[in-house]
Each structure stands twice: as C-alpha cells, then as structure tokens.
C-alpha cells in the first residue's frame, strides 16, 4: 500500500515538473516573440520616418537650392546708389 502511494506521488511530481517546464517554455516563447515584434515595429517606424520626413525634407532642400541658383542667374544687376 505504501509503495503504491510513493509511485503515485512520484508520478504527480514528474507530471508537475513537465507542466512547469512546458509553462516556462511557453512564457519564454511569448516574451521572445513580443520582443521580435517590437523590434520589427521599430524598424517599420524608422522606414516610415524616412519616407514621410527625411525624403520630403531632402526634396524641399534640393528644390529650394535650385530656385535660389535660378534666381541668382536671372536677377537683374544691382544699381548703384548714384544711378537711382
């Protein structure tokens, strides 16, 4: 009778250990997947920042420089004060 109780207690202990190990593995998997999803989201946001902020800024800067150079080429010469 005592041996049957000991085997049952050992079996319950082993099953408990298996459940504990599976739970820890699931928890670690969830944490790793959450970290990777966060990392992927950050990379996507950086790409969106490049598309929405950096590229238009470079475009506006280049167009402004082109207009400035064009204006300097076509503006009339400055009159001297004596000629006015």
UniProtKB/Swiss-Prot annotation:
Q: How does it sit in the membrane?
A: Single-pass type III membrane protein
Record keywords, A-Z: Apoptosis, Host Golgi apparatus, Host membrane, Membrane, Transmembrane, Transmembrane helix
Q: Which residues lie on this side of the membrane: Virion surface?
A: 1-18
State the CDD domains in the record: HKU1-CoV-like_E
GO BP of this protein:
disruption of cellular anatomical structure in another organism; viral budding from Golgi membrane
Where does it reside?
Host Golgi apparatus membrane
Name one matching Pfam family: CoV_E
Membrane-spanning parts: 19-39
Sequence ranges on the Intravirion membrane side: 40-80
InterPro entries assigned: E_protein_bCoV (IPR043506), E_protein_CoV (IPR003873)
Of the GO CC terms on this record, one is: host cell Golgi membrane
Q: How does it assemble?
A: Homopentamer. Interacts with membrane protein M in the budding compartment of the host cell, which is located between endoplasmic reticulum and the Golgi complex. Interacts with Nucleoprotein.
Kindly give the HAMAP family that the UniProt entry links to this protein: BETA_CORONA_E (MF_04204)
**Protein role:** Plays a central role in virus morphogenesis and assembly. Acts as a viroporin and self-assembles in host membranes forming pentameric protein-lipid pores that allow ion transport. Also plays a role in the induction of apoptosis.
Q: Which family does it belong to?
A: Belongs to the betacoronaviruses E protein family.
Recorded protein name is Envelope small membrane protein
The beginning of the lineage is: Viruses, Riboviria, Orthornavirae, Pisuviricota, Pisoniviricetes
